[in-house]
Amino acid sequence: MILFMGGTEDHAVTSFQKYYPESVHIITSDKYAEKYETLLDQWSGEYNFRRGVVSFVEDLFESTGVNSLVGAFYEALHHEMENGHERTAPPQLAVGITGGTMHMAVTGTYLAQLAGGFVFYVLRP
């Protein structure tokens, strides 16, 4: 699971309870990176998933922001390939677009389709 996250984290827990991910990676802005490093440690123990990476984008509101989001997404995928379990078929990739900015949601949707995953949005935590 890859979650695009902004300042509010409640929807992340709803995502874990609905999809029971093997692992979780978070993409956020530099403003929230430290917060999600701590929360991902806590959540991985509480919800029994493998802790992934917290990738952050420093140029979120600049013209290069989308390129940085793409790089962060592929950093998470690469980490998953290097550290995930060996299997005969890849797991279904869930990409959460509830948090963050509109261009994070659009980029996440596009990348989920390219990677063969599915996109979800949490209406209410």
Label each region the model flagged.
Residues 7-8, 99-101:
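Short glycine-rich anion-binding loops that position phosphate/pyrophosphate groups of nucleotides
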Residues 95:
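Conformationally flexible catalytic loops at phosphate/diphosphate-handling active centers
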Residues 1-92, 106-125:
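Long, low-complexity, Lys/Arg-enriched
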Residues 30, 98-99:
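Short histidine/acidic/glycine/proline-rich micro-motifs that form metal-
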